[in-house]
Design a protein with these regions (language model features):
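Small, basic N-terminal interaction modules of short regulatory proteins
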Residues: 1-58, 62, 97-107
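Short E/K-rich amphipathic alpha-helical oligomerization segments
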Residues: 54-76
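Heptad-repeat register of long alpha-helical coiled-coils used for dimerization/oligomerization
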Residues: 29, 36, 43, 72-75, ...
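Short, compact, well-ordered microdomains
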Residues: 78-104
């Protein structure tokens, strides 16, 4: 995931202002709302991916963690389902990490 350079520059400028003593209730409220919205989006994505993973786990009779370990060891072949499962699991892990990071910053 790449970050827009202008966005990153704006965030750094706000950080610099805040470090120099600047305060704004509007900026604080906006950031709180932004984090809340992003947490909800990441949770929704994680939940949707989790549903698909549950289907695959039921179909193949193993957890996604066990699947990935076995898939990476070359024990499960290379069918389209296996690559799809791997992609869904990696996307779910990424979404979970986003939730964790965003929740740590949310008020």
């Amino acid at each position: 995931m790449s970050v827009s350079v202008p966005t990153l520059d704006r965030i750094r400028n706000l950080e610099q202002l805040y470090r120099s003593g600047y305060r704004s209730a509007t900026v604080d409220a906006t950031i709180d709302k932004l984090l809340s919205v992003e947490v909800a989006k990441a949770r929704q994505e994680a939940d949707s991916l989790r549903s698909r993973l549950a289907e695959l786990e039921t179909e193949y009779g193993m957890s996604s963690a066990d699947f990935l370990r076995r898939f990476q060891a070359g024990e499960l072949g290379d069918s389209a389902d296996m690559f799809e499962w791997s992609a869904y699991y990696q996307m779910w892990l990424s979404a979970q990490e986003r939730v964790r990071l965003l929740e740590a910053q949310a008020v």
